[in-house]
C-alpha cells in the first residue's frame, strides 16, 4: 500500500559528490525540492518529487508535515552502545588518561536494558537510522534494542589486546578475533551487519590488526579503528614513554612491548590498515604528513568532536581535512564520553567552531556515512528504492 508525506522542502542529497574538495561543490547547499513529496510503501521509498508533479501522477492524499525540511536519515559512524549505562560516570576535561581511569571501573558492569532503550530512543527521535556500533560484550542486546526502533546497526566486534590463540606461531585465524558473544546474534545480523574493528594501534597486537583488516577486506566489510586520538598515543608509539605507557603496562601491554617508533597514521599505513574501506575514528592529532597519507589511501575519517572536547584530548584539524579532500563522517562516540547521542549537536559543534556550512555538514551526516559503511544501496539519500527513513533539519541550520 502506498502512502505519501509532504514537506515545505526536501533535500534528497542525490547525485551530490561526496568528495570534500572545495572545487567539488562540497561546501554548496544541496539541491532543494520546494513543496516536495515522498511516496513510500512504509518500508521503501517509491518516489520523491514536487507536490505539483505528485498531484499529476498520483491519486493519493499526502500527509502534510508542515513547514519543515526533510533530509536523508542520519548515520552515526561511531558509537559504543554497550557503554550507554556510563552516562555521567566518567571524569571530563582532564585528558584521556584521567578519563579512562575514571571510566574503567564502570565498564565491567553490563549495560542495562533501560540504558540501551533510552539511548536508541534518543537517536531515533533525532533522525538517526543507522549506527556503526563497536561491541563485544552485548551484541545481541544492542542489536535487539536497535531493531526494536526500526533502525539498523553494524556490530563491530572490537579486536583488543595482545593475547590471541596461535599468534606466537603466526597462525592466528580471523575466527579467533570474534568474541564468543557473536554466536548470540541472529543469522541475518551475522551475514549482513557483523564486522571487525581494531581498538587502537597501542592496545592491540599488530598481527591481530592485520588479520582483522584482511578479513574485512576479503568479506567486503569496512574496518574501523581509533586513530591518533590523544597525545599520549603518539608518545607511546614513538618513544615508548609517558603516563599512558605506564597506564597500559599495568593492564594491556606485554612485558616485551617495543614501540614502533612511528606516529599513529604512518604506522597504520605501514601495517596496511588504511584504504578506501577503512574508517579512522577521531584523528585529532594529525600533521600535514598524516593528512596526506589519509587522503592518498582513500581512508575516511570519522569525527567525534564533542567527545574529544569533553575528554580534553584536543580538536581535530577539520578545515585541513576538508581542504585536503578527505571524506569526513560524524559519530557521537559513547555516553561515557558525551552528553547525548544527537548527531545534530556534533554538526552544530563543527558549524560553530569551524564555520563549516550546512551543505558540508549534511554530507557528513548522510551520504558520506553511507558510503563509508558500504550501505549506499539502502541509506544516504532520499531516492527511489532506498529505505524509507528521513530526518527533519533543525530550524537553526
Positions of predicted regions on the chain:
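Active-site glycine- and acidic-residue-rich loops that bind
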Residues: 133-136, 197-213, 227, 309-312
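Alpha-helical scaffold segments that flank or form the walls of functional sites
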Residues: 69-70, 87-151, 172-189
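N-terminal metal-binding scaffold of metallo-dependent hydrolase/deaminase domains
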Residues: 1-57, 375
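Hydrophobic faces of well-ordered beta-strands that scaffold small-molecule active sites
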Residues: 75-77, 131-133, 153-157, 194-198, ...
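Glycine-enriched alpha-helix->loop->beta-strand junction motifs that scaffold or abut catalytic
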Residues: 149-152, 215-222, 273-276, 293-302, ...
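His/Asp/Glu-enriched, well-ordered alpha-helical/loop segment
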Residues: 252, 270-274, 316-395
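Active-site gating loops and adjacent loop-to-helix segments of metal-dependent hydrolytic enzymes
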Residues: 85-115, 157, 230-275
